[in-house]
Amino acid sequence: SSAASDVYKRQVPSNLDYDMWLGPAPYKPYNKHRVHATFRGYWDYDGGGLTDMGQHYMDPVQYLLGKDDTSPVKIEVDAPQQHPDAVGIWRKIVYTYDDGCQIVLEGEGYESKGKVPYIEGPLGKVYQGFECTIPDVMEKIAEMPDPEPQNTDFLACVRNREPFALDELKGHRSSTLVNLGACALRLN
């Protein structure tokens, strides 16, 4: 038999309840790459780095753009055809809102023409590493109050029955955004 077919002939470790691990995902024979950290590379469980960490990057972008209460009307991808089981690379995903605002995500394999801003707006540009063209930005940030740590803020909101700043609807919007991107990749 070939090495490729042997990859699915692995014994499930005795300390792993593989059926519980799979949960509602479709059954696939055990393979060490389908569990632990590498499960993120399979569509059955995740959508790669985009859906694994994407919402954490999209939350502040949506907030800064005032898009917490809306969704894009168009999603375009620049990517090779995705494998049916394994998450592949993508070069770019462009989310366009009804007002023309765009969020552009650059992925692996994207070759930008020069330095591309992380956030760009009418007051300036913010680049990776917080390099910024906004005049006096550090002074403006220093004037802002320090936010409560999220876990402290969350517990206080539960105790006082107040809305949490990062509520479930904002989380839903950011999660939906990256999942729509993953769907667009698969339909590409």
Label each PLM-derived region with a short phrase:
Residues 19-99, 173:
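Rossmann-like dinucleotide-binding domain that binds NAD(P)(H)
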Residues 1-8:
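Short, small-residue-biased leader/transition segments that mark boundaries at the very start
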Residues 11, 47-51, 140-144, 168:
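Hydrophobic alpha-helical scaffolding
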Residues 83-87, 94-149:
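NAD(P)-dinucleotide binding in Rossmann-like oxidoreductases
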Residues 9-18:
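A catalytic-pocket lid/entrance helix-loop region that shapes and gates access to the active site
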Residues 157-188:
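C-terminal helix-rich "cap/oligomerization" subdomain common to oxidoreductases
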